[in-house]
C-alpha cells in the first residue's frame, strides 16, 4: 500500500542543518515523503526534483501559481506519488501529522479533505465519538476545481480502495465544481468497493443517496453518517447525545438573547479555519439572511478581510490576504485578537463567534490566549453598559 512506510522516514531526529536539497536527501536516503513550506513561486523547482525521486509531497505553501499546481500534480501521477497541496493545512498519515492536526486514534475511516480544518474537524469528531482514521489526505483547496480535475482526490480514493484498513471514506470539501463532482460520483458508483460520505459544505442541491454514497452538507452530519456505516448502535447513542446538546444550546441562546439591547443586532465571526468559517456562514445565512465575508462569492456581500465589518460579517483569517509574509493565524493569533477586540467595541454587535484550533503546530497555550481575549472583549462591553455573547468552537482532542 502506497503509504505503509510513511512514518519510517520520520523516526530519525535530524539535528543537522542542510544547505541544499541534495545534501538533505543524501542524509535521509530512505525517505519517502517530504514537506514543503516555502514561498509559492519557488515550489515548482523544488517539488519537481522531489517528485522525480518518487517522494510524496505535503505542500503547506500558498501563492503557488495554478499552472504550477497542474504541472506538479500531473508529474506526481506519472511517478505514482501524492502531491498534497498546495495550501494543504493538514494531512495525517499512519498517525503522523503534517501541518496542523491532532493525535487521532487509529481506525477504519479514510478522510480526503480539500482544506486543513475540514480534516481536523472531522477527525477530531470521529475521535470524540470513539472511532478513528486510517489516513487523512489533504489534497489542496483547488483540487476539486474543473481546471485541476480532482487529480489528487481521485488518487487518494485509489489509495483507500486498496487499503484493507479503510472500511469507509469521508470526503470533505466546500462546493465541488460540476465536472469533478460527477467524475467522483461516477467512479464511486461504478468501481468502488467501499462506502463513501461526501460532505459538500454549501452545496445547493438536495442529492439522493445511492447504495455506496451518502451526501451531507455539514461536517457533523457527515461524521454521524460514517459512524452509521461502521457501528449502528454507536450511531444511535451518539445521535441522541448530539440532539440533546443541540436542544441545550438553543435554550442557552434564547436566554442570552434576553441580555442584548435593541441596538445589538449583528453577529461577527473571526476564524482561523476556512471550512469552519464557511460552514458557519452557510448556517447563519439560513437563519438571518446574507452575511458579508471574504469567502462570499456574491459580489454584493464579498469584502476584503482587512476591511471594516458590515452588519453581519464572518472573516477567515487563513485566506491568502492574511498569510502573505506572515504566519497562519493558527500559529500567530495576534492579528485576529486585535480584530475581535475592535469589533467587540461596536455598540451594534451582540454576538461574536470564533474557532479555537488546538493541537500539533498550533500556537502554544492557545486556549488561554483566546480565553483572555474573550474575557477582555466582554469586560470592555460591560464598561460601556452592554453585554456581549461570545461563542467559541474548540477543535481538538485531549491527547
Regions found by a protein language model. Give the residues of each.
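Catalytic-core regions of core metabolic enzymes
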Residues: 1-399
Amino acid at each position: 500500500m502506497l503509504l505503509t512506510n510513511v512514518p519510517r522516514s520520520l523516526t530519525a531526529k535530524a539535528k543537522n542543518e542542510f544547505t541544499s536539497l541534495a545534501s538533505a536527501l543524501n542524509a535521509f536516503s530512505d525517505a519517502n515523503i517530504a514537506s514543503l513550506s516555502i514561498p509559492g513561486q519557488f515550489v515548482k523547482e523544488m517539488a519537481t526534483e522531489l517528485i522525480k525521486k518518487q517522494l510524496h509531497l505535503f505542500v503547506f505553501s500558498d501563492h503557488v501559481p495554478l499552472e504550477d499546481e497542474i504541472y506538479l500534480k500531473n508529474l506526481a501521477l506519472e511517478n505514482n506519488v501524492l502531491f498534497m497541496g498546495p495550501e494543504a493545512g493538514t494531512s495525517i498519515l499512519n498517525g503522523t501529522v503534517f501541518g496542523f492536526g491532532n493525535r487521532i486514534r487509529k481506525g477504519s475511516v479514510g478522510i480526503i479533505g480539500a482544506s486543513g480544518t475540514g480534516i481536523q474537524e472531522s477527525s477530531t469528531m470521529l475521535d470524540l465519538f470513539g472511532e478513528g482514521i486510517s489516513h487523512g489526505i489533504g489534497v489542496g483547496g483547488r483540487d476539486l476545481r474543473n481546471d485541476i480535475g480532482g487529480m489528487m482526490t481521485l488518487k487518494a480514493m485509489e489509495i483507500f480502495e486498496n487499503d484493507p484498513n479503510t472500511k469507509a471514506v469521508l470526503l470533505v470539501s466546500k462546493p465541488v465544481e460540476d465536472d469533478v463532482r460527477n467524475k467522483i460520483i461516477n467512479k464511486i458508483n461504478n468501481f468502488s468497493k467501499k462506502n463513501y460520505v461526501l460532505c459538500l459544505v454549501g452545496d445547493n442541491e438536495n442529492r439522493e443517496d445511492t447504495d455506496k454514497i451518502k451526501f451531507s452538507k455539514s461536517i457533523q452530519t457527515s461524521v454521524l453518517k460514517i459512524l452509521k456505516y461502521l457501528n449502528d448502535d454507536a450511531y444511535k447513542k451518539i445521535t441522541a447525545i448530539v440532539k440533546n446538546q443541540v436542544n441545550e444550546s438553543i435554550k442557552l441562546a434564547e436566554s442570552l438573547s434576553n441580555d442584548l439591547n435593541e441596538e445589538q443586532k449583528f453577529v461577527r465571526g473571526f476564524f482561523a479555519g476556512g471550512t469552519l468559517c464557511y460552514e458557519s456562514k452557510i448556517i447563519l445565512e439560513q437563519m438571518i439572511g446574507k452575511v458579508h465575508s471574504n469567502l462570499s462569492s456574491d459580489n454584493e456581500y464579498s469584502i476584503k478581510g482587512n476591511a471594516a465589518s458590515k452588519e453581519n460579517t464572518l472573516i477567515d483569517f487563513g485566506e491568502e490576504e492574511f498569510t502573505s509574509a506572515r504566519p497562519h493565524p493558527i500559529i500567530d493569533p495576534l492579528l485576529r485578537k486585535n480584530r475581535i477586540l475592535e469589533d467587540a467595541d461596536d455598540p451594534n454587535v451582540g454576538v461574536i463567534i470564533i474557532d479555537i484550533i488546538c493541537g500539533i503546530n498550533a500556537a502554544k497555550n492557545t486556549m488561554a490566549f483566546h480565553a483572555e481575549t474573550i474575557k477582555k472583549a466582554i469586560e470592555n462591553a460591560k464598561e460601556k453598559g452592554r453585554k456581549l455573547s461570545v461563542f467559541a468552537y474548540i477543535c481538538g482532542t485531549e491527547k
